[in-house]
Structure formats: C-alpha cells, structure tokens
C-alpha cells in the first residue's frame, strides 16, 4: 500500500514541500532563516490574536487597554513583549535572509526575489502600523511624520494624506483603520509566503557554490527539518531572553507616555529596524527627494538582478565583491546608528555620506567590480 502522505491531496502538498523535497546537500545555516521567518510570522499571528482580544482601537482607551493587558490580563505582559520583541527578531531574520540572497546571488531566481521584495514591503508596513497602536508619544508622532511624507507627492499629496488620516490630523479614524490593516496584513503576508515558496520550489534552492545542485540532492526530512529545528530553538532562546530579561531594550521610553498632540518629543524616531531608511530619508534636504530615496533604498533590490554582470553567481570565490559586501553591511549599520541620532552636525554629514555610499555601492561600485573580476578570471 502506498504511503498516505504520497497519495492524500493535502498531505501530498506538505510531503512535497517539507518531507520528500529534494534539497541541495551543501546549503549552510544561512539558509535556515527562511524557516525562522515562518516561525516568526506564526508567533506574531498567535500573540497578535491574543492581544487583539483585549485591545481597543480608540484614541481615548488604546493606551489604557495596553496598560490593562500588561497589568491585569493573565500573562498579558508576556504576550505583549513577545509580540514587540518578536517583531525585532522578525526583522533581524529578514535582513540576514536578504543579505544571504545578495551574497550568494539568489536574486537570479527572479519571481522568488520579487515576491520577497513585496513581502519585505508588506512586513515593513505591518510593523509601522503596529507601532502606532499603543498610542504613546512616539506612536502618534511617528504616524504623523511618516504619513505626512505622502504630502510630498505632487498635486494629490495633501488629499492623499487627509484620506489616509480620515480627517485633518492623526486621530481616531487613523487608529481604527491602522488596527484593521495591521490585523489583516499578516494573513496577506502568509499568502505571499506560500507564493514565494511555490516559485522557489519551481526552480529549486540556490546553494553556496551557485552551481546546479541537481547531481547531488538529499531529502529535506530528516536532514533539514533537524537543522531548522535547531535554528528554531536558538531563535526561541533569544526571544525568551529578550522578553523575560530585557523587554524594553529595543523600545523607546517616549512610548510609555500617552500620545499628546500638543507636545512634540525632542527626537522623533522609528523602531531600530527602520532607522537605516529613516537616516536616508533625513539625509536629503528636499521632502520629495527624501521620500523617493526612502522608497528606493528598498526598491533598489528589485534592480539588483540587472546590475550584476558577474559570471560567477555567488561571491564565495570573488574576494573584491566580498569586501564591498561587508562595506555595504558596515554602511547600513552606520545608517542605523545615524537614524537614531539628533538632526545636527556631524550626524547630518555622516548620514549624507553613508547614504551616497549605499546607493553608489549598489548601483555603480559593485557592478563595476563584477566586470573587473570577470576580466581577472578571463571570462
């Protein structure tokens, strides 16, 4: 008798994706982050669901309802901090996942890469709206500053901002719609993840050598299920350490003050995972230019497949490209640091130089280096 997992219509899909899937034999731990992102998404949906049971999306009671969750709901504080710190780990895994894709040339799998960019934008939008919900000072002013950027769009900008706000300022309608969107987006992200995996399994996974792995494949289970489980344990260890010992390490103290439209905080800044993009936005004096640079800082990933003329897919045997990749990582860390600093010298100048370097590396320096390496390899 044939095994039920190979014949049952539903079990067959799971079997072909997680059990009998032929996987390259040499993929490193950097390939673990896809499954870790799936775990993060699951944790966020479950904790978010329990938070939504006690949260009220109303300007007068939102802050109090979050306080109520932390003080009066059984293990409410755990759920709240698991959700908040889970978002940070989600982005940490996302950045490593995208970095792995750049380093090993995974962007040649165009459909998978482009859906991945859509996923990145969706997760960023979800996280931004989630940060507004506790209705603290940084929630309110963060929402005001970021939504106001849309007013830079010529002709329709102001109308668009007022349409998103549901009024003439960030107020009750804004909070209500942000909660509705924050609730629905993770399910859209889940659907996009399925499509992401569908396209990945069409071509098969990339590997550190960038060569075809067809001659040497191994079944996903038990090899990579075990490996992913170890990664998951380490992720949970890190998440629980953050949640139970340092719950407020990555948060902003200003968000423990209820939102006050009459009192602007001295330094308005988003969560740490948006600081690099925020630094790029602030480094351009023109409002529209800043918005374009902000969007392009992520959208530039979409043109990466067309900017890499390298004959070798991965950077594994290309030391010049490796060197530039790590300069790019250092540059992004610098931008993250600058995004959290006040708008004054020398931070303005450092931010502008780091922004120029970021776009130069992506658009010009790295592609030119690829051509040089091709020449050196006589390809």
UniProtKB/Swiss-Prot annotation:
GO terms for molecular function: metal ion binding; ubiquinol-cytochrome-c reductase activity. The keyword Lipid metabolism does not apply. Its cofactor is heme b. GO terms for biological process: mitochondrial electron transport, ubiquinol to cytochrome c. GO terms for cellular component: mitochondrial inner membrane; respiratory chain complex III. Heme b b562 binds at residues 83, 182. CDD domains: cytochrome_b_C, Cytochrome_b_N. A ubiquinone binds at residue 201. It comes from the Eukaryota. Pfam families: Cytochrom_B_C, Cytochrome_B. Keywords: Electron transport, Heme, Iron, Membrane, Metal-binding, Mitochondrion, Mitochondrion inner membrane, Respiratory chain, Transmembrane, Transmembrane helix, Transport, Ubiquinone. This is Cytochrome b. The lineage of its organism: Eukaryota, Metazoa, Chordata, Craniata, Vertebrata.
């Amino acid at each position: 008798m044939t095994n039920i997992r190979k014949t049952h219509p539903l079990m067959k899909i799971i079997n072909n994706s997680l059990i009998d899937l032929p996987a390259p034999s040499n993929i490193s731990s950097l390939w673990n982050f896809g499954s870790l992102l799936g775990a993060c998404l699951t944790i966020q949906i479950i904790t978010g669901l329990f938070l939504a049971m006690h949260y009220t999306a109303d300007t007068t009671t939102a802050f109090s309802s979050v306080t109520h969750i932390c003080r009066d709901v059984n293990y409410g504080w755990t759920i709240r901090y698991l959700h908040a710190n889970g978002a940070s780990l989600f982005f940490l895994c996302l950045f490593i996942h995208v970095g792995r894709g750049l380093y090993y040339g995974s962007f040649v799998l165009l459909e998978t890469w482009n859906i991945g960019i859509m996923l990145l934008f969706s997760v960023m939008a979800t996280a931004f709206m989630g940060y507004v919900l506790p209705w603290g000072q940084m929630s309110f002013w963060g929402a005001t500053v970021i939504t106001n950027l849309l007013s830079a769009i010529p002709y329709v900008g102001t109308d668009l901002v007022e349409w998103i706000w549901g009024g003439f300022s960030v107020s009750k309608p804004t909070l209500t719609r942000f909660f509705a969107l924050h609730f629905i987006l993770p399910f859209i992200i889940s659907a996009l993840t399925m499509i992401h995996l569908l396209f990945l399994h069409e071509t098969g996974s990339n590997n550190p050598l960038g060569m075809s792995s067809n001659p040497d494949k191994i079944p996903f289970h038990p090899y990579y299920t075990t490996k992913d489980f170890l990664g998951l344990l380490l992720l949970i260890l890190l998440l629980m350490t953050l949640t139970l010992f340092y719950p407020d390490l990555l948060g902003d103290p200003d968000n423990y003050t209820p939102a006050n439209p009459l009192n602007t905080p001295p330094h308005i800044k988003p969560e740490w995972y948006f600081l690099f993009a925020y630094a790029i936005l602030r480094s351009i004096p023109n409002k529209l230019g800043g918005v374009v640079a902000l969007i392009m800082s992520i959208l530039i990933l979409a043109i990466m497949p067309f900017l890499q003329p390298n004959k070798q897919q991965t950077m594994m045997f290309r030391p010049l490209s490796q060197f530039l990749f790590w300069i790019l990582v250092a540059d992004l860390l610098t931008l993250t640091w600058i995004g959290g600093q006040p708008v004054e010298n020398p931070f303005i100048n450092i931010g502008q130089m780091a922004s120029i370097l970021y776009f130069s590396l992506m658009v010009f320096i790295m592609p030119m280096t690829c051509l040089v390496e091709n020449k050196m390899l006589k390809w």
